[in-house]
């Protein structure tokens, strides 16, 4: 996910985003490191994740070898 889009979602009333297929809420974004602090919707756990792991849908494209 783009850092500016992630920052927009912090202040929006948009639905959840997904980190590794799990619904999360973005709490903060560090644009310089391209990392975000997210909170799990399921259990409330907070973690730091790369913006590349955050999607606006729960579907992650898998590549088969």
Swiss-Prot record:
Disulfide bonds: none annotated. GO terms for biological process: asexual sporulation; sporulation resulting in formation of a cellular spore. Transmembrane segments: none annotated. Pfam families: SspH. The keyword Iron-sulfur does not apply. The keyword Metal-binding does not apply. Keywords: Sporulation. It is found in: Spore core. One of its GO terms (cellular component) is endospore-forming forespore. Belongs to the SspH family. HAMAP family: SspH. This is Small, acid-soluble spore protein H 1.
